[in-house]
Amino acid sequence: MSEQHSVAVGKAANEHETAPRRNVRVKKRPLIRPLNSSASTLYEFALECFNKGGKRDGMAWRDVIEIHETKKTIVRKVDGKDKSIEKTWLYYEMSPYKMMTYQELIWVMHDMGRGLAKIGIKPNGEHKFHIFASTSHKWMKIFLGCISQGIPVVTAYDTLGESGLIHSMVETESAAIFTDNQLLAKMIVPLQSAKDIKFLIHNEPIDPNDRRQNGKLYKAAKDAINKIREVRPDIKIYSFEEVVKIGKKSKDEVKLHPPEPKDLACIMYTSGSISAPKGVVLTHYNIVSGIAGVGHNVFGWIGSTDRVLSFLPLAHIFELVFEFEAFYWNGILGYGSVKTLTNTSTRNCKGDLVEFKPTIMIGVAAVWETVRKAILEKISDLTPVLQKIFWSAYSMKEKSVPCTGFLSRMVFKKVRQATGGHLKYIMNGGSAISIDAQKFFSIVLCPMIIGYGLTETVANACVLEPDHFEYGIVGDLVGSVTAKLVDVKDLGYYAKNNQGELLLKGAPVCSEYYKNPIETAVSFTYDGWFRTGDIVEWTPKGQLKIIDRRKNLVKTLNGEYIALEKLESVYRSNSYVKNICVYADESRVKPVGIVVPNPGPLSKFAVKLRIMKKGEDIENYIHDKALRNAVFKEMIATAKSQGLVGIELLCGIVFFDEEWTPENGFVTSAQKLKRREILAAVKSEVERVYKENS
């Protein structure tokens, strides 16, 4: 029998469930606090980590020096006629990384907390504090200030739509909000509904001497503040720096108000890919035990010499937990952004990866696929001889051919240099990634670890431990949860076959959705189990493998089910596909792929097919039928090479004109597809594909 990574801790309640299981190392008792820690609140945990770190560098960030604009005119077919469209590209000039020690983080945490209390935000849960901002060092410092005063934080994605933002602000009766200067204009309408907001803090001073973008940043922020004052003259407005200064001057006047374990720490709003955002209620006890669970699976693998690059939304539980894990390891937490990760969108400076040189990087499938395709595009530009050398080295490493370490290091050196040259682990979480993509990164860069969890469980479920590495699974149960599978009869998954819906229980599992008893009753059992909505299976080693989200399993005309996310992860690995939404109509046999094409590789492909000439803009050929059909054939070849068969093979594809971003409403901030919105935009074209295949 193979080594077991989880163990049964009791008997199955009935024939429709598996026995509950835990990580084999916590069979007797799941963790409620991190190893070697006595903390039971986030404030105690932060203080413990920061004191241990002392004068070591603990946090790093870059400032925006300038934003450069480049305009480009493209020609598109609109209603059968050529139309010129002007597009603007932005390029960021960034400062070198600035550092702050762990000791300084203690000072900032306390100064910010005292400043918040001094301006009028009440501690110990009397007031709630809303954060509507992009990931940055100031986001985290505001959060730390709040927990030092026992002020619950409400998080919302910085790309949350107006209705969702109003919903989260009004429902929680938040008294204060922190936002980015660039988001101030988005606050004007919500603040007219959210009457409980009395304090607004913005992340940068509004300085008339700010000449970035020819003064546009200053003017936009100033105009937004003036309009906010018009509609809400009662709101007190401060910059981040002003609040810290107020706190520094109030050391002898304002006391700290540390929270208790059962106190509310955070209401984290989901991104709402289908329904209205739900507020997940998380206590200090929940989050600290969640940090314990995730940390348990990577304990000893990551430490104080590591540098973690942070760029995912901090409103996402996955990112929040891993930033606190970085504090726990006493490594350096460095902030970046998707826009400045590589040299592609920077000017007069290096991208975050090369500048910061991370050893650990956390990402989601959409980001990793973009990185992989950029690498593959560079490889395709090499001479045929160099391409052959690259793929020969790849094949030898994949097959573990002895004595090829030096060769692979030399061949893959440039790829590693492009990501800073020091990565030892990368992690994917939030959505499924294809085995091909996981294998590619693990061979040419470093091992890709898979993590799986939910907001409701503080990102706790599974983390693939480095010494248990295997492709295609989400890994070992973390150290703080108990898991079981239950039958999903209508979809044909049964516990007796070690398959079913995953239910989780333990200290990280929240108890409710904020002011939402109906959703709470649907998702939580009377005895504390959380229904994840994910269909999974136990592997022979006691690890977990995800089949798909229950809501993403669609029955087709012939009565068989297809797993949408599984198909998307495979088709997305094709070099011509930047993103894809697989749509399955229950009245049809096969699905259709709605594809955002990858412009670089597609341009070369179109030239190779003699559909366009070298130097022409691919956007003018997006709707060329011959090009679309050629890409479709390539996608089917990709699918077959990765084991897709029958109804998993698309019957056709349509091309989408623009990239899907949180800003245009086609994906959430966590890069999850908004399927309804995507389908609505190309419904007639999807119907055309079905008609052509009927």
From Swiss-Prot:
How it assembles, according to the record, is:
Interacts with FRK1.
Q: Which CDD domains match?
A: LC_FACS_euk1
Q: What does this protein do?
A: Activates endogenous long-chain fatty acids (LCFA) by esterification of the fatty acids into metabolically active CoA-thioesters for subsequent degradation or incorporation into phospholipids. Acts preferentially on C16 and C18 fatty acids with a cis-double bond at C-9-C-10.
**Any idea which UniProt keywords this protein has?**
Acetylation, ATP-binding, Cell membrane, Fatty acid metabolism, Ligase, Lipid metabolism, Magnesium, Membrane, Nucleotide-binding
Q: Tell me the compartments it is located in.
A: Cell membrane
Q: Is Cell membrane one of the keywords?
A: yes
- Cellular component, GO, one term: plasma membrane
| Modified residue annotations for N-acetylserine | S2
**What is the official name of this protein in its record?**
Long-chain-fatty-acid--CoA ligase 3
Please give the cofactor(s) recorded in the UniProt entry for this protein: Mg(2+)
What Gene3D superfamilies does this protein map onto? N-terminal domain of ligase-like
Give this protein's Gene Ontology molecular function annotations: ATP binding; long-chain fatty acid-CoA ligase activity; very long-chain fatty acid-CoA ligase activity
* Other facts: Present with 6440 molecules/cell in log phase SD medium.
The EC number on file is 6.2.1.3
GO BP of this protein: long-chain fatty acid metabolic process; long-chain fatty-acyl-CoA metabolic process
* Family that this chain belongs to: Belongs to the ATP-dependent AMP-binding enzyme family.
Please write the reaction equations for the catalytic activity of this protein: a long-chain fatty acid + ATP + CoA = a long-chain fatty acyl-CoA + AMP + diphosphate; (9Z)-octadecenoate + ATP + CoA = (9Z)-octadecenoyl-CoA + AMP + diphosphate; hexadecanoate + ATP + CoA = hexadecanoyl-CoA + AMP + diphosphate; (9Z)-hexadecenoate + ATP + CoA = (9Z)-hexadecenoyl-CoA + AMP + diphosphate
InterPro entries attached to this UniProt entry: AMP-binding_CS (IPR020845), AMP-dep_synth/lig_dom (IPR000873), ANL_N_sf (IPR042099)
* Gene, per the UniProt record: FAA3
